[in-house]
Amino acid sequence: NRGAQLVLSRSSKEMVTELFKLEVPEIAEEVIQIRSVARDSGARTKIAVKTNDVRIDPVGACVGMRGSRVQAVSNELGSERIDIVVWDDDPAKLLINTLSPAEVTSIVMDDDSGIMEVIVKDENLALAIGRNGQNIRLASELVGWEIQISGENDNLDVKESPENALIKYIGVDQELADKLIENGLSLIHISEPTRR
C-alpha cells in the first residue's frame, strides 16, 4: 500500500492568482481583484484586473516599479510572458483591452451562440491572432466568448463582381467597367472622403 498521493501542478490558473497575491499587496488586501485568468502554461498568461479604489491603477500596481512585481511572478513561472489588462464588465470592451495594441474596428456579438465576430485593421491581424493563434485563444478564454477574427479586407463583399463594384461605387457605365477590368484593374479600395 503506497498511501495517499499528493499531486502538485504549476500549470493551474490559481497558481498565477496566488503568486500575484504574494507580490501585490493591493491584491492580498482586496483593493485590486483578479477577475479572469487565461493561461497557456509555460508560454503566456493573460489576467484581467479591476480596482475597488479609483485612485489606484490596477495594471500599474500589478506591474510594479520597473516591472518588478510582474517579473517576480514571471520568474516563478519559468519566464512565462504575462499580459495584464483592465477588466470591464462589458465583454466587448474587455476584448478591446485584451487585444490592445491591435486596433479593433468592429465587434458583432451573438448572445445566443456566445460568438463575437471581431474585425481588426489588416495590419494588426497577425498581432491580434498571435503566434500559432495563442493570443486570440487566450483572449477568448479570458473574455469567455468564442471569437471569430478577421481583417477589414477579409470582409469585403466577395459576391459582388468587380464590374458591379465599379458601377456602384465609382459611377461608371458597364462598358467602361468592362474595359477597366480587361486592363488589369482588380481591386478597388473605397475610403471615406477626407474633409479639409
Where are the predicted features?
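RNA-contacting regions in translation and RNA-metabolism proteins
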Residues: 1-187, 191, 195-196
